[in-house]
Amino acid sequence: MLALEVALLSDRGGRNYNEDACGHWHSDRHLCCVLADGAGGHGGGDIASKVAVQELIGRFSRQPSPDGAALGLLLRETNVALIAQRVPGTPREDMHSTAVCLVIDFIAHAAHWAHAGDSRLYWLRDGRVHRRTRDHSLVQALVDAGVMSEADMQGHPQRSELRSALGIPPEQLVVTDTDGDDTVQPGDVFLLCTDGLWEYVTDPTLEQTLAASSTPRAWLDALAATVTEAASHKTSHDNFSALVVWTRTA
C-alpha cells in the first residue's frame, strides 16, 4: 500500500480575484484530486472553476471509477453540468474552465487522470519529469507540428488560446485520458498546476526545487517564490495554483 501526502496552493497573483480552484477527496482506497482554471471574469470564471472541482469530486466520490476512460466521462458530464448553470445576462453567461483530475488507487499502486484545457499534470519519478499532459491549446498544436519548441510556449502571446475547455458545446469538447500501464512507485510525485504557474516554471526548475524540498509544502513554497519573482515585472500577472501528491511506502 502507498502512503500519500497532499498539499495545495492557490494565489490570486496580480489580479483582484482568483479564478482558480482545487480540491481533493479520499476513501480507504482512492485519492481524487482536481484542479481548475476558470475564465469569464469575476462572477463567471471563479464560479466555473468551483463548479468543475465540486462536480468532479462529487461524481467520483459517489461512484469511484478509477480508470482513465471513466474519468474522461466524468469530465464530459461535468461539462454538461457547468453549461446548465449558466445565467443569461450575467457574468455566468459565458463561463468556462479548464480541468485536470487525478485518481490514485493506493492499494493497487495505480494512477489515472483526464484533462481538458491547459491546466497540467506532471508526474515526477526519481526527481525527474517522467510524464506530463499535453495542453489543448494553439501553442501546443504548434509544438506538436514542429513549428515551435516547448521552451517557446512559455510567454507566447497566444499561450492562452485554448482548443478545449469545460463550457463549450459537448460535441466540441476534447478530453484526454490515460490508458495503458500507469503503475505508481513509492517516491513518485504528482503535480497538478494552472498555466499561471507553469508559464514561469521550467522542467529543470521543477526538478531542482523538488530536490531541495523536504516536504510537499516546502516544494509549493519554492514554486510560489519562483513565480512571484519571475512575474514581478507584471503588475497583473495571472492567478497560479498547484496541488501536489507525494507517495511513499506505507
Predicted regions and their residues:
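PP2C/PPM-type serine/threonine phosphatase catalytic domain
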Residues: 1-250
